[in-house]
Amino acid sequence: MATTTVVCGGGGDVEGCDGERSLDLLPAALLETIMTKLDVASLCSLASTCKTLKSCVTRVLTFTPNFHIFNVSLSMETVRPLLFPNQQLSSLKLDCGRLGNSAIDILVRPSLREISLHNCRDFSGDLISEIGRKCKDLRLLCLGSVAEKVGRSISRCALEDLLNGCSHLEVLALMFDLSLYLRPGDGRIFGLVSDRLTHLELGHITSRMMTQLLTSTEISGQDSNRVTTSTVLQNVQRLRLSVDCITDAVVKAISKSLPSLIDLDIRDAPLEDPRQVSDLTDFGLHEINQNGKLKHLSLIRSQEFHPTYFRRVSDQGMLFLADKCLGMETICLGGFCRVTDAGFKTILHSCASLSKFSIYHGPKLTDLVFHDILATTLSLSHVSLRRCHLLTDHAIQKLASSLKLENLDLRGCRNLRDETLTAVSHLPKLKVLLLDGADISDTGLSYLKEGVLDSLVSLSVRGCRNLTDKFMSTLFDGSSKLALRELDLSNLPNLTDAAIFALAKSGAPITKLQLRECRLIGDASVMALASTRVYEDECPGSSLCLLDLYDCGGITQLSFKWLKKPFFPRLKWLGITGSVNRDIVDALARRRPHLQVSCRGEELGNDGEDDWDSADIHQHIEAQEDELEQWILGDEGDVEMEDAEDESEEDASEED
């Protein structure tokens, strides 16, 4: 079959090119039919190649049912022409980081059945209100960070408009702090929610509000304050909450009021140690899963604001939990400082269907938990033992007997040594291995090359301070094709540019590379990565979507020349030390507005410390080719960045 090749050059200016004339011979209807199979980001990429395809894309965008772009924040000037003509849009998923209230009329329309808007910091409650008034047939709604910008707010009326108007909602995720806008007694407004709701996720709400929502007060003759179970949310199967403090009362209310619950994820981050009457105890755990349908449970107490734990839960509470959770498939427990091996072991030996087991900060968890794991019928695929300081290699050797392990998170287990790597190197399905802070050596990591490295997709050795360049030369010697996509080499004091040369030379298609706080990494590493050709027909550095160079000691303004286009065309997140040269950093951010430049040491990407995400209802779209950004941005900004560099060079000359 003959193929038609579009040959384009000059940043998309293809007048007179042979490829465009060939495309003109094809019926527009044929091209448009093919384009209906593509997502919006791909359509925009096509539109940047030639006039024929741009014309077809323009027509397709008037009737495409789905508009999903999460990898870049679009401006109002870009969104308006893309969305305005489309009256058949049913699903809108967008990063609104550069939009505000002026975009409400463009975004909100009656035809929508799914809305997922992230980074809505510059929107007020008007966005929520308008969705309730216009989107009567909405099935899925996810709103993130609404009104977080100073001066924006959300009223109770806005939430009432939403819950009254969207009477067919099945999925509702309000990922912002509701407690800032609702009074203590306002939790009952959720009584207006659709009875079709099966998935509810709230960014933050007080335990008191949640308890009020799930209980109702009946007034009768002799018993004027009898509290009964509410029928609100009775069809909810998945509930994810962040509350001020997890208490027995809220756990009891959830268990008794949600008879259909399958998945419960609740966490808190108290500002101080809770009092006994307002904390979770053994009796609270006894209330979990009253209806016996729960398959997935996550109870996390974070130390984000204060070093506090579930101090009133003991091994007895774990015995209660194990008795009620025999059919559990996923269990995640964090902050249970009084629970010992006996408690955790009871969970493992009671839940025969368990496939995912996570313990965050288990200070009393030791190797004995896994001593006789072979006596169970467990088939674990995901295990996380983060910050369990008493674990040693012996525990991992026992755990590795489960050959179905795909994800192993051992971050903060500082007593693990090379014997751990010997054990995990024989796991044929292992895709994720996180070893932050472990006491491992170059020799230990070389064991991975003997087996598991071919399947490994993500590897983190952050803070493993014994490591040198040698392990990089061993792993990336080019002798085999690697599946590795994510690599965290942060806080390795002995890592130098030579290690990055080995990585670049191997051509490994890394999409996420973290080098923060590597003091010996400098400009040479950036140049090597920028010059990498992952595939023969790709642009240099084409695979990297995230690059974190924060606090790398050798980075100077020279690196910024290699961070401009055409280098790193897929880069969406960049971490850098702002003090290198603030003017050049600002110029780079203006030149590449869709590149999120972080200068304050924030962790990049969406992988939070506690893995609090909504990947199940968000469609994560892979970073597209640079044509998308090119189509949106054009050629603006080159001169501005060059001027900043020239000024910097002049200042340096004057100082000399």
Curated annotation (Swiss-Prot):
Q: What are the start and end residues of each LRR repeat?
A: 71-96, 120-145, 151-176, 194-221, 243-268, 277-301, 310-335, 336-361, 362-387, 388-412, 413-437, 439-463, 464-491, 492-517, 518-551, 552-578
Which InterPro entries does this chain map to? F-box-like_dom_sf, F-box_dom, Leu-rich_rpt_Cys-con_subtyp, LRR_dom_sf
Outline the extent of the F-box domain. Answer: 20-66
What CDD domains does its record include?
F-box_FBXL4
Q: What is the residue range of the signal peptide feature?
A: none
Q: Where is this region: Disordered?
A: 632-656
Question: Aminoacyl-tRNA synthetase among the record's keywords?
Answer: no
Cross-referenced Gene3D superfamilies, in alphabetical order? Ribonuclease Inhibitor
List UniProt keywords, sorted A-Z.
Answer: Leucine-rich repeat, Repeat
Superkingdom assignment: Eukaryota
Q: What is the name of the protein in this document?
A: F-box/LRR-repeat protein 10
Give the originating organism: Arabidopsis thaliana
Q: Which gene is annotated as encoding this protein in its UniProt record?
A: FBL10
